C-alpha cells in the first residue's frame, strides 16, 4: 500500500469520500487518488515522492506554473501586513482596475471568494435587475453548486428543469430552463415559450466541464442577439476561461460582449477567489448602491489579491498567450497523432491554454450528447497508463486539460513519448 493509499483510507474516516471535492476521489477512473505534497513549475509530487508532469494545474489557476517565484514573493510580502481585515484595501481597487483594463465589457467588478459565489451572485443580480425569475443554462455546462444551477433538463424539449442533486427543492429547479449547447434552436424555443420570464442566459463560452467544447461558429453571437431581442442579460461564465483562453478571456477571443461576466481561478494565482462584473448600470443594482444584496467576509482578501495581481501582471507581458496556445496545440495534436498511429480513434479540441481529447470515431465533438457517447472504457485505461508514466491528467473524461507557461519542450516531449507507449499497450489489448 502506498502512502497515498494510506492517506486516502485515513481521510475517509473524517472527510466524506475522503476528499473535499468529488472529482478528486478518482471515481471517474477508478483506483485511489494521489495525495499531493508539493508542486513546482510543471510538476507535482505525491506523498510517495513520485513526480508527475501536471496537466490539471489546480483545475486551471496555475497558468504560470506551480509555485511561481513572483506569486510566492507577492504572497509573502502581503502576509507581513496581515491576513484579512474585513475592510477595503488598495489591493482590491488595483485588482478591479486590472480586470477592467483587460476585459472591456466589465465596467465595474465585485470580488468574492469562489466561482460558485460569483455565478450565484451574478444570477441573483440578473434576476433583480430584470425583475424576472427564470434563468437559462446549458446541459453539460457547470457553473458551481448553487441550487439553481444543479439542474438538468426535463424529459421533454420544453419542460421545466429537474434537480440533479437531492436537497434541491423542485420549486427552485422549476425556474431553471436547460437548453442544448451549440444549438440556437433549442434556445429560441425556450424564449418563445417564456418570452417575458427569462432573466438571463448563463453559459461557459468554452464548455470545460464536458471536457473541452468550443462554441460553433455563430453560437455566441446568436445568444447575444436573442438576449437583446427578449431583454434578457447574457452572463458569460469565465471562471475557467478567463485569462486562460486569451488576455481578454473567451469573450475577447470570440468577439462577443456579455452584460455580466464571472471570473475565478486565474485571477487568484492559486488562492481562493471569484469575481463578477459587467455593465455599470447593472452593477449599480447591487448593494450598497442598489437593492440586490450580496456580501462576503473574505471578499477582496489581501493575500488573494496580491497573488492574483502578480499573476495578472505576468500575463500582460508580450507573447504570453501565443506561446501558451502553441504549446496547447502541440500537445493536443500530438495525442491525436499517437492515438491514430496505433489505431485508436480520437478527436481533439483546444483553445488558448485548455484542451480536450475524446475516444470516439467522430471527427469533431461539439455537443454534450457526443461526449456522453465516447468510449467509457478507454479513458480510464489511458488515464492510469499515463499516471504510471508520470503524467497527471484530469481524472475524469468530462474535464478539460490545462497547460501552463512552465511546460517546456522537455515536458511536452516526455508527455507525448509516454502517450505513445500507453497507446501501444492499449492497441495490443
Swiss-Prot record:
The keyword Translocase does not apply. The modification N6-(pyridoxal phosphate)lysine is found at residue 265. It comes from the Bacteria. Pfam families: Aminotran_3 (PF00202). Its cofactor is pyridoxal 5'-phosphate. Its main location: cytoplasm. InterPro entries: 4pyrrol_synth_GluAld_NH2Trfase (IPR004639), Aminotrans_3 (IPR005814), Aminotrans_3_PPA_site (IPR049704), PyrdxlP-dep_Trfase (IPR015424), PyrdxlP-dep_Trfase_major (IPR015421), PyrdxlP-dep_Trfase_small (IPR015422). Its EC number is 5.4.3.8. Gene3D superfamilies: Aspartate Aminotransferase, domain 1 (3.90.1150.10), Type I PLP-dependent aspartate aminotransferase-like (Major domain) (3.40.640.10). Keywords: Cytoplasm, Isomerase, Porphyrin biosynthesis, Pyridoxal phosphate. Pathway: Porphyrin-containing compound metabolism; protoporphyrin-IX biosynthesis; 5-aminolevulinate from L-glutamyl-tRNA(Glu): step 2/2. Coiled coil: none annotated. The keyword Ligase does not apply. SUPFAM superfamilies: PLP-dependent transferases. GO terms for molecular function: glutamate-1-semialdehyde 2,1-aminomutase activity; pyridoxal phosphate binding; transaminase activity. GO terms for cellular component: cytoplasm. GO terms for biological process: protoporphyrinogen IX biosynthetic process. NCBIfam families: hemL, PRK00062.1. PANTHER family: GLUTAMATE-1-SEMIALDEHYDE 2,1-AMINOMUTASE (PTHR43713), GLUTAMATE-1-SEMIALDEHYDE 2,1-AMINOMUTASE 1, CHLOROPLASTIC-RELATED (PTHR43713:SF3). Belongs to the class-III pyridoxal-phosphate-dependent aminotransferase family. HemL subfamily. This is Glutamate-1-semialdehyde 2,1-aminomutase.
Amino acid at each position: 500500500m502506498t502512502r497515498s493509499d494510506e492517506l486516502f483510507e485515513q481521510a475517509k474516516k473524517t472527510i466524506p469520500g475522503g476528499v473535499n471535492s468529488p472529482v478528486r476521489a478518482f471515481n471517474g477512473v477508478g483506483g485511489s487518488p494521489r495525495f499531493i505534497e508539493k508542486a513546482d513549475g510543471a510538476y507535482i509530487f505525491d506523498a510517495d515522492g513520485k513526480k508527475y508532469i501536471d496537466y490539471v494545474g489546480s483545475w486551471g489557476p496555475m497558468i504560470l506554473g506551480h509555485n511561481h517565484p513572483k506569486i510566492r514573493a507577492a504572497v509573502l510580502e502581503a502576509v507581513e501586513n496581515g491576513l484579512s481585515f474585513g475592510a477595503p484595501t488598495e489591493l482590491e481597487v488595483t485588482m478591479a482596475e486590472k480586470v477592467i483594463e483587460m476585459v472591456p465589457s466589465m465596467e465595474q467588478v465585485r470580488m468574492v471568494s469562489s466561482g460558485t459565489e460569483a455565478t450565484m451572485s451574478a444570477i441573483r443580480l440578473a434576476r433583480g435587475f430584470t425583475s424576472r425569475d427564470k434563468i437559462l443554462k446549458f446541459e453539460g455546462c457547470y457553473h458551481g453548486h448553487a441550487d439553481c444551477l444543479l439542474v438538468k433538463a426535463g424529459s421533454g424539449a420544453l419542460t421545466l428543469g429537474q434537480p440533479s442533486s437531492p436537497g434541491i427543492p423542485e420549486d427552485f429547479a422549476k425556474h431553471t430552463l436547460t437548453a442544448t449547447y451549440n444549438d440556437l434552436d433549442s434556445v429560441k424555443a425556450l424564449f418563445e415559450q417564456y418570452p417575458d420570464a427569462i432573466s438571463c442566459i448563463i453559459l461557459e463560452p468554452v464548455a470545460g466541464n464536458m471536457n473541452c467544447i468550443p462554441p460553433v461558429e455563430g453560437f455566441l453571437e446568436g445568444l447575444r442577439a436573442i438576449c437583446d431581442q427578449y431583454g434578457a442579460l447574457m452572463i458569460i461564465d469565465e471562471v475557467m476561461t478567463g485569462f486562460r483562453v486569451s488576455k481578454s478571456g473567451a469573450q475577447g477571443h470570440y468577439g462577443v460582449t456579455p452584460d455580466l461576466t464571472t471570473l475565478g481561478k486565474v485571477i487568484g494565482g492559486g488562492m481562493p477567489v471569484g469575481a463578477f462584473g459587467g455593465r455599470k448600470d447593472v452593477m449599480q443594482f447591487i448593494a450598497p448602491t442598489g437593492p440586490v444584496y450580496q456580501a462576503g467576509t473574505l471578499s477582496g482578501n489581501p493575500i488573494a489579491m496580491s497573488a492574483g495581481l502578480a499573476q495578472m501582471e505576468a500575463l500582460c507581458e508580450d507573447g504570453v498567450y501565443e506561446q501558451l496556445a502553441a504549446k496547447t496545440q502541440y500537445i493536443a495534436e500530438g495525442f491525436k497523432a499517437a492515438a491514430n498511429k496505433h489505431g485508436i480513434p480520437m478527436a481533439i479540441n483546444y483553445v488558448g491554454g485548455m484542451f480536450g481529447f475524446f475516444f470516439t470515431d467522430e471527427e469533431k465533438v461539439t455537443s454534450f450528447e457526443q461526449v456522453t457517447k465516447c468510449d467509457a472504457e478507454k479513458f480510464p485505461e489511458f488515464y492510469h497508463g499515463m499516471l504510471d508514466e508520470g503524467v497527471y491528467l484530469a481524472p475524469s473524461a468530462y474535464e478539460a486539460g490545462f497547460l501552463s507557461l512552465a511546460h517546456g519542450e522537455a515536458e511536452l516531449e516526455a508527455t507525448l513519448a509516454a502517450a505513445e507507449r500507453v497507446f501501444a499497450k492499449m492497441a495490443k489489448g
